[in-house]
């Protein structure tokens, strides 16, 4: 079983913020396939569905971002999901808007949601899709910046990025060859 995790903060006020881009990608996949996160357990909203012939566990942690691992690790354990079948989608300040970077493994890179997942799983050896949101340029603090909603102009770019990232996830589910998916989907979304 594959496990697709989108990171974000719960609540209406966080919708369409930079920090919630992981939720947006998972929501895009779910909406296009008419799935819903209809279950809750271990601090996570989730569903198990069949997609491209593969059983898939979709998770959105119902903790705040910094505690995401408290939802992800117990659900993966409960459903006996191997860490090699996990993909986490999240915002990345070190990538410009429009950039998507798929990685087989790696550090948290300063992202507190990823730090929590790595700590709870006891490893950083899992796949991730880093979605560029850029850095603040006008002296705004990083916390204020990532919790700020995208502008209308930014949303034009980010809608393409969301769709691109969702297709990358679906491609991995279908093929299980993450190296091929990386070659196809890494880079700038136009």
From Swiss-Prot:
Disulfide bonds: none annotated. GO terms for cellular component: cytoplasm. GO terms for molecular function: peptidyl-tRNA hydrolase activity; tRNA binding. The record marks 91 as: Stabilizes the basic form of H active site to accept a proton. This is Peptidyl-tRNA hydrolase. Keywords: Cytoplasm, Hydrolase, RNA-binding, tRNA-binding. Belongs to the PTH family. GO terms for biological process: protein quality control for misfolded or incompletely synthesized proteins; rescue of stalled ribosome. Signal peptide: none annotated. The active site is at 19 (proton acceptor). The record marks 9 as: Discriminates between blocked and unblocked aminoacyl-tRNA. Hydrolyzes ribosome-free peptidyl-tRNAs (with 1 or more amino acids incorporated), which drop off the ribosome during protein synthesis, or as a result of ribosome stalling. The keyword Protein transport does not apply. TRNA binds at residues 14, 64, 66, 112. It comes from the Bacteria. InterPro entries: Pept_tRNA_hydro (IPR001328), Pept_tRNA_hydro_CS (IPR018171), Pept_tRNA_hydro_sf (IPR036416). The gene is pth. It catalyses: an N-acyl-L-alpha-aminoacyl-tRNA + H2O = an N-acyl-L-amino acid + a tRNA + H(+).
């Amino acid at each position: 079983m594959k496990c697709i995790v989108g990171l974000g903060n719960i609540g209406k006020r966080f919708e369409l913020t930079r920090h919630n881009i992981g939720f947006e990608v998972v929501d895009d996949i779910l909406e296009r396939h008419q799935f819903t996160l209809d279950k809750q357990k271990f601090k996570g909203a989730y569903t198990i569905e069949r997609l491209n012939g593969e059983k898939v566990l979709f998770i959105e942690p119902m903790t705040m971002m910094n505690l995401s691992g408290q939802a992800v690790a117990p659900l993966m354990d409960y459903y006996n999901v191997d860490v090699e079948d996990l993909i986490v989608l999240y915002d990345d300040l070190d990538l410009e808007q429009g950039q998507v970077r798929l990685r087989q493994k790696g550090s948290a890179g300063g992202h507190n949601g990823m730090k929590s997942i790595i700590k709870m799983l006891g490893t950083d050896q899992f796949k991730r899709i880093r979605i560029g949101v850029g850095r603040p340029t006008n002296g705004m603090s990083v916390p204020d910046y990532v919790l700020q909603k995208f502008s209308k102009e930014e949303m034009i770019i980010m809608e393409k990025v969301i769709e691109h990232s969702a297709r990358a996830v679906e491609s991995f589910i279908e093929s299980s060859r993450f190296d091929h998916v990386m070659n196809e989907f890494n880079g700038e979304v136009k």
